[in-house]
Amino acid sequence: MTDDNIRQIAFYGKGGIGKSTTSQNTLAAMAEMGQRILIVGCDPKADSTRLMLHSKAQTTVLHLAAERGAVEDI
């Protein structure tokens, strides 16, 4: 995959407006169409990736940075 093929989508806004639901449904549809997708949840209080993983605790960006150094170093 070249950089020309990479697309980024951001969902943002105040809490409770459906960002997680919209992002999960959009990405699920894209995956079903054969697209390779990556979701990065950056809300330390309500990370949307746990919705896809049935509330299983996952390593977060904050944990990764704490283990490996600054985000810029990763």
From Swiss-Prot:
| UniProt GO BP | nitrogen fixation
Q: Write down the EC number.
A: 1.18.6.1
Q: Which residues bind ATP?
A: 13-20
Does this entry carry the keyword Iron-sulfur? yes
Please verify whether the record's keywords include Glycoprotein.
Answer: no
Write down how the cofactor binds this protein: Binds 1 [4Fe-4S] cluster per dimer.
The family database entries (InterPro entries) matched by this protein are listed as: NifH/frxC, P-loop_NTPase
Question: Which cofactors go with this protein?
Answer: [4Fe-4S] cluster
Stored Pfam families: Fer4_NifH (PF00142)
Q: Which GO terms describe its molecular function?
A: 4 iron, 4 sulfur cluster binding; ATP binding; metal ion binding; nitrogenase activity
Mind listing the UniProt keywords for this protein, alphabetically? Answer: 4Fe-4S, ATP-binding, Iron, Iron-sulfur, Metal-binding, Nitrogen fixation, Nucleotide-binding, Oxidoreductase
Catalyses which reaction(s): N2 + 8 reduced [2Fe-2S]-[ferredoxin] + 16 ATP + 16 H2O = H2 + 8 oxidized [2Fe-2S]-[ferredoxin] + 2 NH4(+) + 16 ADP + 16 phosphate + 6 H(+)
Q: What is said about its interaction partners and assembly?
A: Homodimer.
Family membership, please give it: Belongs to the NifH/BchL/ChlL family.
Role, per record: The key enzymatic reactions in nitrogen fixation are catalyzed by the nitrogenase complex, which has 2 components: the iron protein and the molybdenum-iron protein.
Q: What is this protein called?
A: Nitrogenase iron protein
Q: Which organism is this entry from?
A: Nostoc sp. (strain MUN 8820)
Q: Which gene encodes it?
A: nifH
